[in-house]
Amino acid sequence: MHKPFSDLRLVLRQLRQSPGFTATAVLMLAFGIGATTAIFSIVDGVLLRPLPFVQPNQLVTLGDQLAGTNWGEHDPGPVTGPEVVTYQRETHAFQSLGGFTGAGYELSGIGEPAQISAARMTPSMFTVLGVAPLLGRVFTAQEDQQKAQVAVLSYITWKSRFNGDPHVLGTKILLDRKPYVVIGVMPRSFEFPMEYGHLYRTELWVPMSFSVQELSPDAETSWYLQMVGRLKPGVTRAQAEADANQVAAEIMRNYPPDAKNFRIHPVVYPLQQIEVLQTRPLLRMLFLAVAVVLLIACANLAGLLLVRAIRRQREIAVRMAIGAPALALLRQMILESVVISVAGGLIGIGLAAFAVEFGRNLLPETLPRVAAITLNWSVVGFALLLAVVTGFFCGLAPGFAALRTNVNASLKEGGRSGSAGGGHARLRSTLVVLEIAVALVLLTASGLLLRSFSKMSEVNLGFRPDHVTTAVYSLPQKQYATQAQIDTFNRRLLERLRQLPGVQAAGMTTTIPATGDGITIFVVEGFVDPRGPDRSTASPSMVIPDYFQAMGIPLLRGRYFTEADDANSQLVVIVNHEFAQHYWPGQDPIGKRMRTGMVKSATPWMTVVGEVADAKLNSPDADAHEQFYAPVAQVEKDAGAYAQPTDLNGNSLYIVLRSALPPEQMENAMRAVVRNLDPQLPLTQVQTMDEVVAQSEAPRRFNTIIISSFALAAVLLAVLGIYSIIAFSVASRVQEMAIRMALGSQRSHIVRLVALSGLKLAAVGCVLGLAGAAAAARILRSFLFEVSPFDPVVMILATLAVFALALAASALPARRAASVDPLQALRGE
């Protein structure tokens, strides 16, 4: 009868007798399992683990797919204020339905004034999500209707800004200098909303409290809100979408005359899918990369076990000769592999725990649900299961190789060292070839990403980020209720900033490059859009003169804005090159006219006075698109919408300073100027434009670093595999080498012979690796920029690198082979 503990004791004793082999195998596998477990922790926390809400599978987003735009195609489109109210009232597929939007506030009344991220939410949103507060309560429908000034804090805000005070309920705070009362604190796990694919850590929540303007007929075309609902039991997404479309048809029938051309189609997506939409490709690529590293580590382990089995051929032959069952030998081989793998798995779990804690700081800020990334029991279970499965399969090859041992031949050979057998050699060579192939796939991917990043750094941004410092301020509506008050503050601030030592140019804007963009609808005089009326969209920016000089945006035609472009002068606009080429191809845009709004809107015409270069509004790898600029001083006459304060947030502007002085010095000077004008006004997001551009490149940089790290690990493991097989081959062919030298072969010939064997393996592996790299092109394509997935330069360099490393891995065994003493080796024979 089989005694498993006897087998285990035997295996442990044999491993203790080979400490070098055991340590090498365990640590090599620990690296592979540790890396895989760490990445699985991220995938589990972000992709696999359910959202921290009640029955999250019933949660869906509801948004508009707007004809003629890409809204709602792959993400939840925005909705309008009137739609939120109508969908809540008229749809029947949802248990509950709520709306929300992000907001920024000046928080004061506790410590230093600060600009915070917040959210306006309908009270039903808390019901939809099914999360109760940790302390206190959430706001009610009555408070929402009565516009009660109450706030619910996030756990992080409660801890950081209120020191976790258990008596925080009832505390009065100021939001945009209006008094609010704290009525609740949400649990630590409550993180909502996450701006889809972007960093958005909400610090507090306030009632939506729609204003009259937000529910007026004019607001029917103001898309800025998001909606989330909980489906009724048994209701499918398709049924919910059909229900919402019936309501949308009624909404469109009630559109005002100037909005009759709009067509909306409500779309419903699972909330879980949307939360991780933009991170899914990245995490999938990470998981594939780490799986490749684990595969190489497993191949190396299998190779080491195979070498160990070959060296134990005489022992195995003796045991088989005295009647040991073949199944028992196979079982012990597999058990030995499993023991090594479990030991590697336990060490790998420790490495993964360290990697998860350390790696959180390296993860891109665009990754949602970072707080959910932990090494929990499910992840530990995954690691141990992975270790057992890895050990089982890695033990099969040496186990079956041992069973094929020729008992008579092995016993006749006695203790002599000779060839390990063609079959065994081919199996070891196959493992190394596969290692080289997958390493080359990763190395090629790394090279393509590095080349893409290099290409992106060479892109003409359309502006000069060097020596530019930016900052944001937001004027609260209570103190700055009119455009005249806003203009006065902006003018005084700009005058003082321009007087600072070292300032070469100073301007202001509602948006800066490399931070994203918004869109607005407009009409170009004499232009008929082939897509139909009200389909022309562009990114608007309201600016204060000297913005272009401060940002370094070149003027191509016409002129920049001046101080004379105020509310009493002709309405003017500056367009970018892409805008001019699209609407006036081959023409001079100067003197052309456009206006914001729709065809039937009564907004005034603006005259084009300048054309500037295309400034990259998103990351450098994003395509340029139409953009126009208008003076802040003319905002009320232009459209009355862009930089106007609302009941909830003031006029938010970026300061843009070009100076030869160090950024730290400029930051202190800017803060002092703002504090002098308004001691309570916080200045936020103070950074250089170089930092802003670097942040926009962060996702691509992260991809490149991660894949390059895995590629390096894979190549090193493959080199180790080449070294081990060549070293063993040399050790098993000592007599052959001695005979060759005894018959007249030069030592240089022996070196070439050994090195050539390594290069042959590398050549076959590279052929397979290049084929694998071509097959992986589909996965890589979306991560590349102006680089072909089959870039010959990258593939040639990666192949040469693998050959060079293979040659280096073969060098030491080759030198050892050449240093064999023929007389001593033959005497041993």
Region spans (language model):
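"Rare, low-scoring activations can occur
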Residues: 88, 183-192, 208-280, 492-506, ...
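Alpha-helical transmembrane segments of integral membrane proteins
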Residues: 1-22, 271-276, 304-331, 335, ...
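Small-residue-rich transmembrane alpha-helices
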Residues: 39-42, 302, 338-410, 451, ...
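Short juxtamembrane loops and helix-capping segments at transmembrane helix boundaries
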Residues: 43-59, 65-68, 191, 198-213, ...
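N-terminal membrane-entry
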Residues: 276-293, 378-382, 697-714, 756, ...
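Short, strongly hydrophobic transmembrane alpha-helices
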Residues: 19-46, 50, 296-299, 341-345, ...
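Interfacial "coupling" helices/loops that link adjacent transmembrane helices in transporter permeases
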Residues: 297-341, 720-762, 766, 813-816, ...
